[in-house]
Design a protein with these regions (language model features):
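Alpha-helical membrane insertion/targeting regions
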Residues: 1-177
Length: 177
């Protein structure tokens, strides 16, 4: 088994790791000082989701070009950014609770359809990613490719719909109200 350097000289993974380690105490500090985390954290989460989606796409492009080391680093970076998202999301829910879509009508139906598929698939992503990365790290590339064909589109869908849910809940709904 090749010992892979998860962070190496790849700065994005280090940035994600720093966000995870330093960001959570900063959120707690801001909350203690009365900052409106309900307004800040959803935008942070949408940014993390978008970043993860871009990294996933670039990682897919890298492997299609047979740039294996670049692919590995991009996918590990996407994993770190997604882990940051999960921690910030759970922190936001713990601090501010869940948010309901404030408008009735067709937009709520679309929102709930997107949200339900996003939520169901998001629950599978950590497990799919863990298995996919484990197989790559242990050089079981035939099995890695088989599960990656499922992991990538699901993970990309969850990243994109995460941004869409944010836009619908925090920007579209208030505009329609």
């Amino acid at each position: 088994m090749i010992q892979r350097d998860f962070f190496g000289r790849w700065p994005l993974a280090w940035i994600g790791f720093a966000l995870l380690v330093l960001g959570i105490p900063a959120i707690g500090f801001a909350h203690e000082r009365g900052a409106d985390l309900g307004a800040i954290l959803p935008a942070v989460n949408a940014t993390l989701n978008a970043t993860s989606g871009v990294l996933l796409y670039l990682g897919w492009r890298a492997i299609r070009a047979r740039r294996i080391e670049v692919h590995w680093r991009l996918m590990v970076s996407a994993t770190v950014v997604s882990a940051c998202f999960l921690v910030v999301y759970l922190t936001r829910v713990a601090l501010t609770g869940v948010h309901r879509y404030p408008v009735e009508g067709w937009s709520k139906s679309v929102y709930l359809a997107v949200l339900s598929t996003h939520t169901l698939l998001a629950a599978t992503v950590p497990f799919l990613v863990a298995v996919t990365l484990w197989r790559a790290a242990h050089e079981r590339f035939d099995r890695h490719r088989r599960i990656a064909r499922w992991t990538l589109p699901i993970w990309l869908y969850v990243s994109v719909t995460g941004v869409l849910v944010y836009l619908m809940l925090y920007h579209l709904a208030p505009a329609l109200a």
